[in-house]
Amino acid sequence: MKKYVGLLLLLTMFSVGYAQENVVKHWEYDINGKNGIACRYVQARNLLFMSGFSVADNDVFYFAGGKPLSVVCFKGTKKVYQRVIDELPTKLSMFKVVKDSVYLVNDQNLTLYRMHKSGQGPVDKVKLNIGKLRPCEGAMQESGFVLIQRIGQPLHANYKATYFNDSGRLIKEEDIENKDNVMCNSSECKKILDSYLYPSAKLVFPDFDGNYKGTWNGYNIFWGLFGNSGKASWTLAFADKDGKVAKRYDINYHLNDMYDVIPLPVLTNDIDPETFTTAPTYCMLHGENLYILGYSGAKKKIILCRINLLNAFNSEQSAK
């Protein structure tokens, strides 16, 4: 009987581990260095800043970061190239790969950079026509990109959204009126600005805090944190067009192991010496997979995590 119970426990542990391995995969990279990813890392405070990342087919990954600002390409964990494109690091993350081109906007000198994704050829530079104000937010979009400027006093400001195409030509400007006079550093203000920066979809999911990542197989995909008095998890939600969750995949955690499976997200927005945030672009949907960029100070590694949507959808259990 004891042997039977022991065997059953072993098989259960194996099936859970296999199920997680079938859903979640990791790649690890050095922080900076000849074979690593260029970034800005403050080891004493365990702060790691990236200027962006993107994914192409066949496990080809593109990263931007560091000082000087570089674009780095990997095939899996094999480095393909690293190319310096600017001496000045970014304070925001605005980076994408579309068709055969890599695009990066440096918010510090208001310049759009474009180069071939092979790393070969010239780097085109376009100075943006946005005036003297520095953008406080920005994001790449499916076509073009948007920068947001703060106008007025920091605590109760209005904003202006400026839209550009992928050639760096100004398309339109839109005033964002702070009708409710919300504070600039509040969650309400963030929601207002995010509505101009990132696509969204309806979701009815109490106790969930996350972001819309795109569509897959007829479902709207959301990624974020779920938490109530009985449970805490990283959660992948599959929702229908009405926002109802049809399926969810949970990676349960306790406070001491929150980043065991899903790594600590990289920082993207360097607002001031004491304020750092992570834009939703640290996590992106590509094809059949969700990719999440993070790091481990203990391991001294940048970690790219991939969640296979089909296997997560078909899974009958959580990852932990």
What residue spans do the PLM features occupy?
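Blade-level signature of beta-propeller repeat domains, shared across WD40, Kelch, NHL, RCC1
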Residues: 281-320
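Bacterial Sec-dependent signal peptides at the C-terminal "C-region" and cleavage site
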Residues: 15-21
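Short beta-strand elements that form the blades of beta-propeller/WD-repeat-like
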Residues: 47-65, 96-106, 142-154, 187-199, ...
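Sec-dependent N-terminal signal peptides
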Residues: 4-14
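Post-signal peptide N-terminal segment of secreted/secretory-pathway proteins
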Residues: 55-101
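Surface-exposed loop/turn elements that mediate protein-protein interactions on large endomembrane-trafficking
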Residues: 21-38, 66-84, 110-129, 158-206, ...
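Coil residues (strongly favoring Ser/Thr
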Residues: 19, 60, 87, 100-101, ...
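Repeated scaffold domains used in trafficking and secretory/extracellular systems
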Residues: 36-53, 89-99, 130-142, 177-188, ...
